[in-house]
Amino acid sequence: MSWFAAHGSKLRQCAIIGGMFSGVLAAACMPAAFAQAPAKDSIPNFASKDFGWQQNEEDWQDPPPGSGHGPIRENPAYPFVNNADGNRTHQQVTVRITNTKDPILKPWAAAQIEATNQEVLSGKREIPFTAQSRCWPGGVPGQLLYPFEPFYAIQTPKEVWMIWQRDHMVRRVFLTDKHSTNVKPSWFGESIGHYENGNTLVVDTIGLSTQKNSYIDNFRTPHSEKLHVVERFTIGADAKSLTAVVTVEDPDTFNAPLSMSKRWFKVDLPMIEVVCSENNDDHFHQNLFPIPQADKPDF
């Protein structure tokens, strides 16, 4: 008997229960995938209304050995000091200064990053440095860098929804579709996924917008509309950790693919309301960034 034949009715109940819980799927709806080594055709359980996935690091970590070029890093001449470290050590809080000498960057990308580096170094601190600082979506893969606030998941036979606590932003991964021929660019693009090895969700994303402040990291690394992102979300054997290995390809921006990783831990907390526009202050003076408003509708 197939997995869906065995659990299809339960999953249909999940879709109903998920709606009752403000879009967060009840853990009881999914069979215990990790009581023993998962079968290759089983589905990992990421979803619950009672727990989320949280990470406490703001930047990408190195990928597994042999995965290729790692993430873009800081200029070692200007070490980054975050708010927590600044408060603890009484150092001046700084903004990330990117290593624009990294040979993986195309000339235009290095020049754009260097321009923002110089704005920071010259003291022009009022500029917003990421989409998130203006309460915009983080995009793909940048949305994965949200620290300290968990994301939650809904799983159905046709889709996986990733719901961030901040602004309750929703990213949809379609499990039964193929990529469209002409994808309209958007913040989260078009994400097509499938399961592998009983513990991994593989997500392939194209059609990502190049709007201002849409970066792949917190070092203000830009991208073109040719950006192609593949994420492999693997749940730990104890079901208490979640690791993503991310591969970024963009032949107009990078001379080779980038690889990076991110790890979350299970937190037994329900989703709460977090409204970004109430908290959109800058690093230095607690000045509020303006919330952007469109001059005309885009629909």
Where are each of the predicted segments found?
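N-terminal secretory signal peptides that target proteins for export/translocation
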Residues: 1-14
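Basic, alpha-helical terminal appendages of large translation-related enzymes
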Residues: 2, 25, 36-37
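PEST-like low-complexity, intrinsically disordered acidic/proline/serine-rich tracts
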Residues: 34-299
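Bacterial N-terminal signal peptides
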Residues: 14-29
